[in-house]
């Protein structure tokens, strides 16, 4: 096994189901890669980022929708931090966070056509995930302290004063266009490359949760996380955000 491989084992071998015609079913030719909570997190984050972006242009002086989307993103980010500890095998940080050197080595192998497939995130993809999570975290934190100086303001803008809150608002906007959209574009380009050039159905896998049976570096099949634990993580995340804003912010 590759020295960068993770140590978890599959919960089972691919199910050998047969159709009436004797042919192996589609499910028998695939294995579990991503559990439901992880997939819901990803697509919910995409939807909320898009909502925050689009709603920033609404004729809404208080930016109600924009702020609601921002709170939702913050809840998801805290949830993902918890899920990265208590979630399914491919969602845990311990299984995909690697050093920049490991990511660079993987990219060299990829360029040479010698990179082996990963069931979860490969070393470069793992760093991209961390970059996106950190980038979104900075974006939301900037929004909490932002103010347009008129009607729209984050809940903590009063802590830093109008002048600083105005500067933060400018950074908040610039960060989105130069960092968030840049990372998102790189992420999309990488997904399209794997999907259509490497023939690795990673986009479909993030919808169905399953990948084709292959000799993956990081295990044959992923172990799904508990839905009950996912629910608890989400409630804790929502409670932290609501409590922080209610206790220390000017408004929810």
Regions found by a protein language model. Give the residues of each.
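Membrane-embedded alpha-helical bundles that constitute the cytochrome b-like, heme-associated redox core
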Residues: 1-252
């Amino acid at each position: 096994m590759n020295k960068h491989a993770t140590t978890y084992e599959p919960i089972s071998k691919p199910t050998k189901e047969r159709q009436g015609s004797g042919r192996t079913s589609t499910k028998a030719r695939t294995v579990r890669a991503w559990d439901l909570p992880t997939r819901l997190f990803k697509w919910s984050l995409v939807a909320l980022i898009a909502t925050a972006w689009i709603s920033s242009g609404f004729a809404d002086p208080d930016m109600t929708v924009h702020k609601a989307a921002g709170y939702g993103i913050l809840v998801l980010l805290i949830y993902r931090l918890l899920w990265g500890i208590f979630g399914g095998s491919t969602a845990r940080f311990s299984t995909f966070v690697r050093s920049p050197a490991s990511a660079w080595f993987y990219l060299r192998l990829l360029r040479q056509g010698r990179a082996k497939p990963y069931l979860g995130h490969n070393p470069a993809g793992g760093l991209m995930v961390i970059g996106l999570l950190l980038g979104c975290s900075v974006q939301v934190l900037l929004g909490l302290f932002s103010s347009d100086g008129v009607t729209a303001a984050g809940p903590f803008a009063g802590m830093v004063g109008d002048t600083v809150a105005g500067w933060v608002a400018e950074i908040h906007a610039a960060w989105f266009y130069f960092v968030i959209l840049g990372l998102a574009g790189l992420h999309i380009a990488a997904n399209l490359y794997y999907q259509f050039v490497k023939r690795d159905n990673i986009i479909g896998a993030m919808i169905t949760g399953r990948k084709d049976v292959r000799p993956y570096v990081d295990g044959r099949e992923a172990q799904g996380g508990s839905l009950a634990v996912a629910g608890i993580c989400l409630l804790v995340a929502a409670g932290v955000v609501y409590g922080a804003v209610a206790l220390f912010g000017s408004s929810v």
